[in-house]
């Protein structure tokens, strides 16, 4: 067997090794998780799961593993949406205050009116302006809701991404590009409380800092446990 053939076989063996190591990352992760759980090792648990869940189990087994889903990393878009809603909200503050002031002034005119006719006219005007103010206020509340939701969603995605990357704070992570890998694993556990079924949501982030060209290869993490039983 010549040197060229040996080199080719060596490459194939290395590739097979890495494939075998990475083909079932969920099993390795869950073995480590339940091992730490049995030892009450909260420190280790907190490095593997974003929201560690205490599961009382003497044994467990994997029932099903979903297909791996790959999606683009969208934190940059989420950050843009958050900033857009923030600007809309800030621009609407003045509009809301102006509508309130106009209504307040009309109510004041109604209180100062001396004749019944003047009071009726002022009240009719105040009622009309109150309806307009309520409409503007509802718009403002909707903008506030949209901003709060966009802000919370971006913050959550940033938290999950940095947890997977295991790099602590990354000030420019919202400008990163890359891919998000997702899996769902169904397991069955048995313990003193009986049999329980859980769905475990896994994530992994592989990102690139466009400013520096540095690649960040995240690890598989447990996003959350869902009790199915």
Give the ranges of each region predicted by the language model.
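Bacterial N-terminal signal peptides that target proteins for export
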Residues: 1-8
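Generic, low-specificity signal for short hydrophobic/alpha-helical stretches with a mild N-terminal bias
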Residues: 3, 15, 27, 167-169
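Bacterial N-terminal signal peptides
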Residues: 9-17
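N-terminal intrinsically disordered, low-complexity tails enriched in polar/charged
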Residues: 15, 21-22, 229
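Short, low-complexity N-terminal intrinsically disordered segments enriched in polar/charged residues
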Residues: 20-39, 47, 54-55, 66-73, ...
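Intrinsically disordered, low-complexity regions enriched in acidic/Ser/Thr/Pro/Gln residues
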Residues: 59-62
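Exposed beta-sheet edge and beta->alpha loop/turn motif
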Residues: 87-229
């Amino acid at each position: 067997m010549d040197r060229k053939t040996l080199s080719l076989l060596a490459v194939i063996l290395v590739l097979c090794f890495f494939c075998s190591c990475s083909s079932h990352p969920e099993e390795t992760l869950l073995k480590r998780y339940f091992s730490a759980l049995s030892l009450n090792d909260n420190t280790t648990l907190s490095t593997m799961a974003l929201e560690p869940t205490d599961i009382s189990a003497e044994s467990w087994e994997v029932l099903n593993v979903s297909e791996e889903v790959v999606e683009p990393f969208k934190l940059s878009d989420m950050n843009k949406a958050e900033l857009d809603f923030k600007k809309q909200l800030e621009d609407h503050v003045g509009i809301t205050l102006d509508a309130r002031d106009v209504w307040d002034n009309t109510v004041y005119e109604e209180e100062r009116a001396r004749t019944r006719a003047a009071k009726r006219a002022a009240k009719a005007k105040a009622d009309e302006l109150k309806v307009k103010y309520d409409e503007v206020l509802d718009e403002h509340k909707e903008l506030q809701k949209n901003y709060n939701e966009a802000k919370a969603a971006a913050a959550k995605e940033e938290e999950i991404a940095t947890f997977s990357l295991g790099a602590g704070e990354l000030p420019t992570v919202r400008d990163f590009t890359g891919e998000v890998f997702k899996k769902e694993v169904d397991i069955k556990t048995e313990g003193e409380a009986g049999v329980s079924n859980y769905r475990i949501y896994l994530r992994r982030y592989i990102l690139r800092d466009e400013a520096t060209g540095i690649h960040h290869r995240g690890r598989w993490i447990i996003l959350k446990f869902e009790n199915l039983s």
